[in-house]
């Protein structure tokens, strides 16, 4: 394949996928996790003109956004993963004090993906040995974030939005993992991408939403009024900045921040990144949700392997697609 043919523009026609060579990416840089929010220019303009939008920008500038807390067990586990002297016994000893985490890790170790020889393990040490320390960290991170997104708060509309975010974030993350798996199958060269990390970057992409919802709650408590339908577009517009703050303070690397912020890319790198996977996922889910208005505004660049993946997924039955996503969610307990 020549360099000129190395990238393709993906378009969708009904249920079929087609591609043409040598086109460019033309992104208006939406937040990738908000694929479910209908495009509405009127609401978007009112959102960025609102007092709440400017209040959020100011809170972010002075580092006053309320951040979700990260559990101590996960912080300790991250430190253990960074220590080259850490053993499986160290991780098992940390987890054994938390019966819920222990049960989830043993269940993951016995899932079809990680138990290919069909040997059931019943103790945490065997489970940690089978999965490996890094995968343990990834599974626990995924479960922690998913639990966090199912937190109940007093404001009914905000609570419903968090539930909605949890559902769609899981859909976005598991689809990222699935696309990553299939890229490894179709690519004719080794990829420096891991489905597990693709899943986590997807789950964490809208983590800043918690801080934004808190700002909205404070805004309403102070006697202000703002239509919640307008507030959703403020959340969409501000989520990249808020998520970047959270991920930076939690110590996540640039791959996570790139997926959360969807930065404008001017140089075309032939290497597929997690951001590429996220953009493919975003475009595919717009197709799945029949969000034609948003799809018309966005194009995504793919190499030939990416084109094959998108062709397979867009022609896959709903039953088979959901089955493959369910295998991923079951493995991670989300």
Question: For each predicted feature, which ranges?
Answer:
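Conserved alpha-helical "signature site"
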Residues: 1-204, 211-218, 247-252, 256-302
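Amphipathic alpha-helical interaction segments
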Residues: 43-44, 243, 329
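Divalent-cation-assisted or electrostatically stabilized phosphate/pyrophosphate-binding catalytic cores
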Residues: 123-126, 160, 220-245, 269-275, ...
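A non-catalytic, amphipathic alpha-helix used as a structural packing/dimerization or gating element
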Residues: 171, 242, 320-323
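Surface-exposed, interaction-prone regions with an acidic/low-complexity signature
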Residues: 172, 199, 215, 220-233, ...
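Acidic, carboxylate-rich catalytic segments that either coordinate divalent cations
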Residues: 289-334
């Amino acid at each position: 394949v020549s360099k000129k043919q190395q990238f393709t523009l993906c378009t969708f026609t009904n249920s079929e996928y087609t591609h043409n060579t040598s086109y460019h990416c033309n992104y208006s840089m939406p937040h990738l996790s908000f694929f479910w929010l209908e495009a509405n220019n009127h609401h978007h303009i009112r959102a960025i003109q609102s007092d709440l939008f400017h209040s959020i920008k100011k809170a972010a500038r002075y580092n006053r956004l309320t951040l979700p807390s990260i559990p101590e067990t996960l912080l300790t586990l991250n430190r253990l993963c960074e220590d080259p002297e850490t053993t499986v016994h160290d991780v098992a000893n940390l987890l054994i004090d938390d019966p819920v985490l222990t049960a989830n890790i043993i269940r993951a170790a016995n899932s079809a993906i990680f138990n290919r020889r069909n040997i059931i393990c019943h103790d945490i040490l065997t489970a940690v040995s089978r999965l490996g320390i890094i995968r343990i960290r990834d599974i626990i991170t995924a479960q922690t974030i998913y639990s966090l997104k199912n937190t109940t708060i007093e404001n009914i509309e905000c609570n419903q939005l968090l539930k909605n975010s949890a559902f769609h974030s899981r859909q976005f993350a598991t689809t990222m993992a699935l696309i990553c798996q299939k890229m490894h199958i179709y690519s004719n060269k080794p990829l420096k991408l891991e489905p597990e990390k693709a899943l986590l970057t997807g789950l964490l992409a809208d983590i800043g939403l918690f801080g934004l919802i808190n700002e909205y709650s404070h805004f309403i408590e102070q006697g202000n009024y703002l239509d919640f339908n307008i507030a959703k577009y403020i959340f969409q517009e501000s989520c990249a900045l808020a998520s970047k703050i959270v991920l930076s303070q939690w110590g996540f690397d640039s791959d996570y921040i790139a997926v959360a912020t969807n930065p404008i890319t001017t140089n075309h790198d032939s290497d597929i990144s997690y951001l590429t996977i996220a953009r493919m996922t975003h475009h595919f889910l717009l197709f799945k949700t029949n969000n034609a208005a948003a799809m018309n505004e966005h194009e995504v660049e793919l190499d030939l392997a990416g084109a094959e993946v998108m062709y397979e997924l867009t022609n896959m039955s709903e039953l088979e697609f959901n089955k493959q996503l369910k295998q991923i969610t079951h493995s991670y307990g989300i």
